[in-house]
Amino acid sequence: MSTSVFNRRWAALLLEALARHGVRHVCIAPGSRSTPLTLAAAANKSFICHTHFDERGLGHLALGLAKASREPVAVIVTSGTAAANLYPSLIEAGLTGERLVFLTADRPPELINCGANQAIRQNGLYASHPALSIDLPRPTTDIPARWLVSTVDSAMARLQHGALHINCPFAEPLYGGDEQQYADWSATLGDWWQGNHPWLREVDPHQVLKQPDWFFWRQKRGVIVAGRMSADEGEHLAQWAEMLGWPLIGDVLSQTGQPLPCADLWLAQPQAQKRLAEAQLVVQFGSSLTGKRLLQWQEQCQPQEYWLIDDLPGRLDPAHHRGRRIRSSVAQWLELHPAQPRTPWADELTMLADNALDAVSGHLVNRFGEAQLAHRLPELLPENGQLFLGNSLIVRLIDALTRLPAGYPVFSNRGASGIDGLISTAAGVQRATAKPTLAVVGDLSALYDLNALALLRQCSAPTVLIVVNNNGGQIFSLLPTPEEDRQRFYCMPQNVEFSHAAAMFQLAYARPENWGQLLQAVEQGWRHGGATLIELQVPPSDGAQTLQHLVQQMTEQ
């Protein structure tokens, strides 16, 4: 038996089975043990192959591809710590629902727990974080091809959200051999190879049901909270809410156009709290809320019922309200639950929100820094493009200080909300859509994922990465951290600048010192055609202090 040839036969069937379930993008890291998988992916004309030398970044690249394409994406890595480096992206996918298929090559069983090189215990490596896991046996002709293909089919049919981990042990040799061998093993699947359907098709029994008392509830005083959703869903939800006459509080990721902008500011006002307390029903669409004041209100509100609607499974309400947890996409819900035109019941919230937006504009009119960037960000967005937001302070400033256009695509990693892999994820988002992309991250986030700048060299449309360099993790300036220890143990300033990083990866670079220069640099980036790194060096605590000042100003009104 030629082990190397049959390894490749086995891997080719495995990859073809994934292609039948909509996998188009395959992300590959270098490695020898994963050779059967890599060669099978390269030979399959259904796939677009992406490569990266860092498995942690590779996993996040796949995450970005899955976010923007809304399709399952496969990842191939070798054995050992290469597999462990996928953990952060796997965790994020589990929380935000992107479908990722992690194919981890492994040593065969006889090389585990005996001191063999690059051999770790990969079975169950990711604990409970994958939605599904398959531990494949060592490839052998004793196992029929129909077992392998139906095993993959069954798992992919059940993979509605999160990650599938397929551990793939391969024995040596991994190279060479007569490629014509073992054709009879593959041929047992007959004309399946000439089609494009799965071998085994399972029917999803999940069905969204119309709430029978919706006619009753839609006549009540309701509030809509909009979390993470698609651009189309955000637009339609805003129209639905307007027809109902219900106030809509939109998160930065809601893409609703935030009819009540600056919610993280005006929610600090007692007048707003009092009016919202009159709501009889709160309906939240999507999870992953960003603003502190919104999260506080969400926890403290006491309507008669609280409905949370999201296609993700599980409990998504940390406040544990009385009400209903309904698994549905926003689009499905709106189709089944039509709005009834009604007079708005909380018009004064519109006044409070508009006043908050005016207060922000007035406060920042002659200031240049990360707060002004957040407030005027819509001016920088590329036409027919998309926006990727980092975590920590910058996403909170954008959520609190501006109003993004309705239906404009916004992406972020707001599941576990880590600062790792953000540039890699943005690169994946760009590749999936081939749209002009604006990404905004902080300096520590950029340092954490610095080698992902290599991925931006291959962007298919103009891409601008703005690095807000406030010299450390200034999100901690918003928290009651011990002042004497804040810089050393929390903010951890690194005193770096990014021109050398841009030069290392052959990216265009600019460091504007005022708004006019920033606008010019961004516009040049859209004309440039490749990737541009724009570094915004700002006073360390200016953004945090601006947000605190504006919240205090709202509280006193």
Curated annotation (Swiss-Prot):
Q: Which organism is it from?
A: Serratia proteamaculans (strain 568)
Q: In which pathway does it act?
A: Quinol/quinone metabolism; 1,4-dihydroxy-2-naphthoate biosynthesis; 1,4-dihydroxy-2-naphthoate from chorismate: step 2/7; Quinol/quinone metabolism; menaquinone biosynthesis
Give the classification, highest ranks.
Answer: Bacteria, Pseudomonadati, Pseudomonadota, Gammaproteobacteria, Enterobacterales
Q: Which co-factor is required?
A: Mg(2+); Mn(2+); thiamine diphosphate
- Top EC class, one word: transferase
Name of the protein in its database record: 2-succinyl-5-enolpyruvyl-6-hydroxy-3-cyclohexene-1-carboxylate synthase
The record, for SUPFAM superfamilies, names: DHS-like NAD/FAD-binding domain, Thiamin diphosphate-binding fold (THDP-binding)
Family of the protein in this entry: Belongs to the TPP enzyme family. MenD subfamily.
Q: Quick check: keyword Zinc in the entry? A: no
Q: What EC number(s) has UniProt assigned to this enzyme?
A: 2.2.1.9
Q: How is the cofactor bound?
A: Binds 1 thiamine pyrophosphate per subunit.
Q: Which Pfam families match?
A: TPP_enzyme_C (PF02775), TPP_enzyme_M_2 (PF16582), TPP_enzyme_N (PF02776)
Which Gene Ontology molecular function entries are recorded, alphabetically?
A: 2-succinyl-5-enolpyruvyl-6-hydroxy-3-cyclohexene-1-carboxylic-acid synthase activity; magnesium ion binding; manganese ion binding; thiamine pyrophosphate binding
What this protein catalyses is: isochorismate + 2-oxoglutarate + H(+) = 5-enolpyruvoyl-6-hydroxy-2-succinyl-cyclohex-3-ene-1-carboxylate + CO2
Q: Does the keyword Signal feature in the UniProt annotation?
A: no
GO BP, one annotated term: menaquinone biosynthetic process
Listed under subunit, the entry gives: Homodimer.
Q: Gene behind this chain?
A: menD
Ordered alphabetically, the record's keywords are:
Magnesium, Manganese, Menaquinone biosynthesis, Metal-binding, Thiamine pyrophosphate, Transferase
What function does this protein fulfil? Catalyzes the thiamine diphosphate-dependent decarboxylation of 2-oxoglutarate and the subsequent addition of the resulting succinic semialdehyde-thiamine pyrophosphate anion to isochorismate to yield 2-succinyl-5-enolpyruvyl-6-hydroxy-3-cyclohexene-1-carboxylate (SEPHCHC).
Top-rank taxon of the source lineage equals Bacteria
